[in-house]
Structure formats: C-alpha cells, structure tokens
C-alpha cells in the first residue's frame, strides 16, 4: 500500500469518527430538547395548556421513530415525579395514543412495569402516583374502564389477606380511595354497579379494621372544636361526600375535556392482570396518621371559603401542598415561593391552607418528615414574601395552639415550643405577652405557664439573659429563667466546712498552671478513700468525693464557654475514665454536673452529650440518673427529656453503624469467595479483577464484628428496659397512691409523665419495635394498670 493511500484511509477514518461524534451530539441535543419540552408543558406561559399540548404532540409524533424509548421513559418519570401535573400528561398520552395506537400500548406496558416495580421495591408514593396515572388514562380513552376496575378489585383483595400487617391492607385501600377523585365520575357513568360493589367492599373492610393506634397519633386528646380523624376514616367520609355529589369535584384540572372529540375516537388498551407482590417481613409500609385540622370556614375572613373537612377538595389541596413541601423542602425560599404560587390560590384562603398544612407536617406523629427548623424557616420566608397577610394568619394559628395546649400531645408540645422560640428569635422576640397573662394564675405544672417557661428557656439559647428579661413584662418574672451561671460550692462562704475544699483549691492552681493529667491524679490521691461519710464504699468501686472535687473544679474552670468545657474534658479524658469505671461512678459524675450547672440547661445537655461521645459515661447510666430521686424536681422539664432522647439516639446510631459495617464485611467476604471461584472457571480474557487480600475481611474479623453487634444489641435492649421499667415504677406508684388517698390521678404531672412514656415509644419506634415481644413478656404484662398498658398496646398497633 502506498503512503498516499494510507494517508487517505487515515483521513476517512478520522472523518468517520468525527461524523459519528457529531451525530451523537446532535441526538443528545434533540433528547435534551424533548425532555425540556415535556417537563415544561402546562406551566405558566402566554399560550394555553391545550395549545401547548397540541404543539408538543406534533413534535413528539415526528420523533417517535428515533426517540421512542427516551419519550417513554420521560413520560413515565413525569407521571411519578410530577403528580400535580397528572392530568396534563395523561392528556398528552391520550393524544399520542389517538395518533399512534402502538405507542399508546407501549406506554401502558411501560407504566404498568413502573407500577409493579414500585410495589416490589416498597416505593409506596411512586406506586400510588402510578396507579392514579393509569386511572386517569381511562378519562383519556387510553385504558378501558373494565380493566381498571379489575385492577382496583385486585388491590382491594389484599384487604382480605390473613396473617399480614394491617398497615399493608390499609395502604392498598388508601391507594384505591385516593385514586377515585380522578376517575370516579367516569366509572360512575360507565360502570356504576361495579363501582358500587368496589365501594361496598371498602366499607366492609373499614368497619372491621382496628383503630387501636388512633389515640397515640392524635395532636390533642380532645375533639373540640375539630375532630381528629384517622386518615382512612377521613378519606372515606370525603369519598362518600363526593359520591353524594355524583362524583363532581371542582379542583382537578382536566385538559382532556377540550380534546374529547379526538380522544373518544381512539382505541383503548386493556391493562394486563396485575397481582400485588406477596407480603414479606422485610417490607415496611407507611404508618397510619391522623388528619390535622386547625381552621374551619369561621376562622377565615371574607373571601374564598375554606372547603369543608369532608369535601374532597380539602384532601386534594392538602395533598398538593404536602407534595410541594416534599419537593422543595431543601431550599426554604423556593419552597415558600412555590407554596404562594399554588395554582388555585384565588379559589381558596391560601394562607390558612398553607399554615395548616405546615403545622400538620410539624405535628405529624410519630415523627415529622423533616427537622423542626425546616418548617420554621419556611414560615419565616412566607412571612417575608407575604407580609400583609401571612404574619396575621400565623399569629392567629399560634393563639389557637396556645388556647388548646391543655390537651396537646407532649411530643407536639415540645415541637410547638421549639418552633415558637425560633420564630420569636427571628422577629426581635416581639409578642403580645399581656394577652396571655391569665396563665400566671395557673399551677406551675399546667401546660400554659409551662409552655411560656420552656419557650423562654429556648429563647435563652438563642439570645442572652438580659435580653429575655427586658422583653418580658414584669408580671412574668416568676417564669423567667434564672441567670445561667455555675454554682461552684468550693468557692462559697460555707466552703471551708466542706470536705475536699483544700484539694479543690490545689486543683484550681494546678490546672491553671497547665498541669498534666498525671499531676491531677496525684493531687486527688490526697483525698482519703473513705469519701464523705468516713466509711469505705461497700464495694470499694469509686470515691464520690474525688469525683465531686475533680468534676466541679474542672468544669467550673471551663465555664467560660462550651469550647472551654470541651477542651478541659478532652485534656483530662484519662482522669474521667479512671474515675468513671462503674455505672455508680458515672451517675456521680452526672450528679455533679447537675449540681454545678442546675441553672444552665443547655450547658448540661451539651456536656452530657460530650461525655457520651467520649464514652466517659454509658447510656444506661444517663437513663438511671434521669429517673433518680435527685431529678424529681426537674422531671417535667423539657431539657431532661432532650438528654434522654439524645442518649437513646446515640445508642441507636451505634447499633446501626455496627450493623452496616457487618453487612458490608459479609458482602465483601461473599464477593471475594465468588470472585475466586469465578476466576478459576473463567478464561484468561474474561477473568474479572479479583478482590485483593487487603479488601477481603477474614472470617475472624467478621466473627468479632458479630460479637460487637450482639453486645451492642444487648446494651440497647438493656437501655430500653431501664427506661420503661422506671416509667412503670413511678407511674404505678402515683396511681396506687392516688387510689389509696382517694385523689384523682389525672394530674398535670401524670399527664406529662404518661406523655413522655408515649414519646419514647414513638420517637424511637423503629428500634423499640425489635424488642416489643421482650417488653410484653417482662414489663407490659396483662396485670399492669390499663392506663400504662394502653400506651404500649397503641404503639404495637402502629405496625400491626
């Protein structure tokens, strides 16, 4: 071959590769353009939705030959990820089906596959949106009403399954009920008897299902002025009202009605038989909830009426607003803007709907979807964007919450405190406190004065003491927190009479001179082993006076800030560990922190959190200390339960971490084994790169990890047993004493305490659930007082 010909061949090859890259680039540009057009269809523009759809259909029809799979994928993704535009996309699919029957069939198959996959992977919201989309395709003459009814009947069959959790049966019924607003009218006109039969089956199920969980999920224990309905009961009442109205609703936009003459000529597809996947123990279903109500039409000023509690429009509006929060919650400004741009805002009192939905999220039981601060920051942005109306509605909501706080769930009480203090801190702590001064006449444990006291404690964390004192009327003096300062007893006037004062003063000098931990240990040796009473401890395990002198002196020297305290603890970590060898010694450390910092709740919280992180104190020691006699006066204060929950969370995270590490190690081990066996079978060309010896954990390492996890599970179980046993003891003692004295046991203290018991169950439900059978066998037995036992039974019913 000549040099010239070789050169030509190289040029041709280069041109071929360049042309191929150009084609790929052009195809990518077209795909991106198609995706952009599909995603933006129906959004606000100068032209109508209908004309947008007509234009898009023409574009997609021309590109179906080349980009069919891409278009199928985008449309099915939109169906799941943009449920608020469901009817826009069903209309688009309907128009495409009218022009290209084959594509319509392919899309239905693709959507069915998405639905089945969502069910299989427990993506419950995605499955519900897929079902809704399939149902709305009946309105667009893409799917036959008969085949949809067969699918809905199959889903209701799940409600008759035996030996499966009720939450599974509930979800399938909920999915069907929440689909009916879209397709109910069409089914009513075409298949009325079949629809009535379906509704009858649903009614039979709803009448027989257990609602033991209901009281555990209520925000208020009272139904006045608004009933707190269980979610399926509420939706069923809304569907019945819709049926009475002949399935006519006023909220869902239906662009396909404009194209009815085109769509009705199209051939329809039948859904294949879809069998829901069988239940597996690994499946997790959505937990039940209570529908939150704060406002009714009497609360709203002149203007659009708030839809009634049992109108389907209320359900549709709330679901849409919840979805906006879910979509935009990561960016508070976008979220607030999207909420205020709600497409039907002129038909409803939007500000009231938004505030109610945000508080519904904040007070959602057992836990809110997102952090408390997420909702607080969104409300602040809403007030900035709508300063003329939103702050007034929010103030009205706050007033309603405060007036109803007497019967508020304890967990919701905490969230209300956290939100209100955060909100005040962003608005110069301005509030009309004089309007609430009637609470000053109530007992200190009553929820109203308790709320103000806790709010001021939280405001103190976000400001400083003088600012809090200045912002409050003088009548509230008894509710204002004391000045947060250390009470170092070895510097008091009577310190000379205290044992250990001399050593404490030596310790102060040594630490200020930047002594080493070993020098501190030597100074502490001057304290006799006999402790306070002059007698040796029965087990000789720890010296209370040594702990007293060391802990109070060190933390007083580090009292300037959190950072100073942390630095002191870290430097003398070894001394702490040496003194805290037993649980009793650890409880003694906690006692001294409380004695020093009893007026500074936040300092106690962060110090105990630090001691847990450094493994100076165990979780079980913290739990035992919280329920000790010493803490009786603090028992109804929020910070104490903040400490308990951070302790339990610390333990839970530790168990989850060990579990994850063990699973990963087992995966690596099994992959390494299979990789080595594959490498023996494969040819040299096909052989995969084996996992290296360094990556592969040994069986001994895996065994040690299993032992660690088992020990952590034992500690976790022990922690929960300690907590629940102490609750049972103090509550049983209170009930027995009240019965003996002939007093009403339903005191403020009792309601706080039973509420805290319920809070532990619900806040840590995933972890406690593992030990429910153990708890039932050892603690929550049938002979326990019914008031206490009911809390446990309601918790178990959440996933029953």
Curated annotation (Swiss-Prot):
Residues 31-243 form the MIF4G domain. It comes from Drosophila ananassae (Fruit fly). The lineage of its organism: Eukaryota, Metazoa, Ecdysozoa, Arthropoda, Hexapoda. Its main location: nucleus. SUPFAM superfamilies: ARM repeat (SSF48371). Keywords: mRNA capping, mRNA processing, mRNA splicing, Nucleus, Phosphoprotein, RNA-mediated gene silencing. The modification Phosphothreonine is found at residue 9. It comes from the Eukaryota. GO terms for molecular function: mRNA binding; RNA cap binding. Residues 1-26, 669-699 are annotated as: Disordered. Component of the nuclear cap-binding complex (CBC), a heterodimer composed of Cbp80 and Cbp20 that interacts with m7GpppG-capped RNA. Component of the cap-binding complex (CBC), which binds cotranscriptionally to the 5'-cap of pre-mRNAs and is involved in various processes such as pre-mRNA splicing and RNA-mediated gene silencing (RNAi). The CBC complex is involved in miRNA-mediated RNA interference via its interaction with Ars2 and is required for primary microRNAs (miRNAs) processing. Also involved in innate immunity via the short interfering RNAs (siRNAs) processing machinery by restricting the viral RNA production. This is Nuclear cap-binding protein subunit 1. GO terms for cellular component: nuclear cap binding complex; nucleus; postsynaptic cytosol; presynaptic cytosol. InterPro entries: ARM-type_fold, CBP80, MIF4G-like_typ-1, MIF4G-like_typ-2, MIF4G-like_typ-3. GO terms for biological process: 7-methylguanosine mRNA capping; mRNA export from nucleus; negative regulation of viral genome replication; nuclear-transcribed mRNA catabolic process, nonsense-mediated decay; primary miRNA processing; regulatory ncRNA-mediated post-transcriptional gene silencing; RNA splicing; siRNA processing. Gene3D superfamilies: 1.25.40.180. The gene is Cbp80. Pfam families: MIF4G, MIF4G_like, MIF4G_like_2. It is found in: Nucleus. Belongs to the NCBP1 family.
């Amino acid at each position: 071959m000549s040099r010239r010909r070789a050169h030509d061949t190289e040029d041709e090859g280069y041109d071929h590769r360049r042309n191929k890259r150009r084609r790929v680039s052009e195809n990518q540009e077209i795909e991106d353009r198609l995706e952009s057009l599909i995603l933006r269809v129906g959004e606000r523009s100068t032209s109508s939705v209908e004309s947008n759809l007509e234009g898009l259909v023409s574009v997609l029809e021309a590109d179906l030959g080349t980009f069919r799979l891409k278009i199928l994928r985008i449309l099915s993704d939109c169906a799941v990820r943009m449920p608020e535009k469901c009817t826009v996309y069903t209309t688009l699919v309907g128009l495409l089906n009218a022009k290209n029957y084959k594509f319509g069939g392919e899309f239905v198959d693709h959507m069915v596959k998405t639905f089945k996959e969502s069910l299989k992977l427990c993506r419950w919201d995605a499955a519900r949106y897929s079902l809704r989309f399939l149902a709305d395709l009946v309105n667009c003459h893409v799917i036959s009403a008969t085949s949809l009814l067969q699918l809905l009947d199959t889903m209701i069959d799940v409600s008759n399954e035996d030996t499966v959790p009720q939450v599974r049966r509930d979800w399938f019924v909920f999915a069907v009920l929440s689909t009916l607003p879209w397709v109910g009218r069409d089914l009513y006109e075409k298949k009325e008897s079949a629809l009535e039969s379906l509704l009858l089956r649903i009614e039979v199920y709803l009448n027989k299902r257990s609602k033991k969980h209901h009281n555990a999920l209520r925000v208020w224990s009272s139904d006045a002025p608004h009933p707190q309905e269980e979610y399926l009961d509420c939706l069923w009442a809304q569907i019945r009202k819709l049926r009475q109205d002949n399935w006519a609703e006023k909220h869902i936009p239906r662009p396909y009605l404009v194209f009815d003459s085109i769509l009705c000529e199209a051939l329809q597809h039948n859904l294949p038989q879809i069998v829901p996947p069988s239940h597996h123990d690994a499946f997790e279903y959505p937990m039940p909830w209570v529908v939150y109500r704060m406002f009714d039409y009497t609360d709203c000023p002149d203007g659009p009426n708030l839809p009634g509690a049992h109108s389907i429009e209320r359900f549709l509006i709330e679901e849409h607003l919840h979805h906006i929060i879910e979509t935009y919650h990561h960016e508070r400004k976008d979220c607030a803007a999207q909420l205020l741009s709600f497409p039907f805002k002129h038909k409803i009192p939007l500000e009231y709907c938004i505030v109610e939905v945000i508080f519904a999220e904040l007070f959602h039981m057992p836990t809110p979807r997102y952090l408390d601060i997420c909702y607080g920051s969104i409300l602040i942005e809403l007030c900035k964007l709508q300063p003329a109306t939103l702050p007034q509605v929010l103030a009205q909501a706050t007033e309603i919450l405060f007036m109803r706080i007497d019967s508020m769930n304890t967990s919701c009480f905490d969230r209300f405190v956290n939100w209100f203090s955060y909100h005040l801190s962003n608005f110069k702590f301005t509030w009309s406190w004089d309007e609430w001064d009637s609470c000053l006449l109530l007992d200190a444990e009553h929820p109203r004065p308790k709320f103000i006291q806790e709010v001021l404690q939280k405001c103190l964390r976000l400001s400083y003491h003088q600012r809090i004192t200045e912002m409050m009327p003088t009548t509230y003096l008894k509710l204002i927190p004391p000045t947060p300062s250390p009470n170092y007893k070895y510097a008091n006037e009577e310190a000379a009479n205290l044992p250990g004062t001399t050593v404490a003063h030596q310790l102060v000098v040594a630490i200020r001179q930047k002594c080493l931990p070993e020098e501190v240990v030597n100074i502490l040796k001057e304290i006799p082993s006999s402790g306070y009473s002059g007698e040796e401890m029965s087990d000789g395990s720890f010296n209370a006076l040594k702990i007293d002198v060391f802990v109070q002196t060190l933390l007083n020297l580090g009292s300037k800030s959190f950072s100073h305290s942390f630095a002191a603890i870290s430097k003398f970590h070894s001394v702490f560990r040496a003194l805290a060898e037993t649980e009793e010694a650890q409880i003694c450390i906690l006692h001294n922190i409380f004695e020093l910092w009893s007026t500074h709740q936040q300092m106690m919280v962060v110090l105990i959190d630090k001691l847990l992180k450094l493994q100076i104190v165990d979780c079980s020691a913290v739990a035992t200390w919280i329920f000790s006699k010493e803490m009786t006066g603090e028992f109804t204060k929020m910070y104490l339960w903040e400490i308990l929950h951070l302790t339990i969370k610390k333990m839970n995270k530790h168990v989850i971490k060990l579990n994850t590490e063990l699973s990963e190690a087992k995966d690596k081990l099994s992959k390494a084994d299979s990789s080595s066996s594959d490498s023996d079978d494969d040819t040299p060309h096909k052989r995969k790169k084996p996992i290296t010896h360094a990556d592969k954990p040994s069986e001994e390492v895996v065994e040690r990890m299993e032992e660690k996890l088992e020990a952590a599970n034992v500690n976790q179980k022990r922690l929960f047993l300690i907590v629940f046993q102490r609750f049972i003891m103090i509550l049983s003692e209170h009930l027995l004493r009240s019965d003996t004295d002939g007093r009403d046991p339903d005191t403020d203290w009792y309601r706080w305490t039973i509420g805290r018991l319920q809070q532990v169950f619900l806040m840590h439900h995933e972890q406690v659930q593992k030990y429910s059978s153990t708890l039932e066998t050892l603690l929550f037995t049938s002979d326990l007082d019914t008031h206490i036992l009911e809390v446990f039974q309601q918790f178990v019913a959440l996933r029953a």
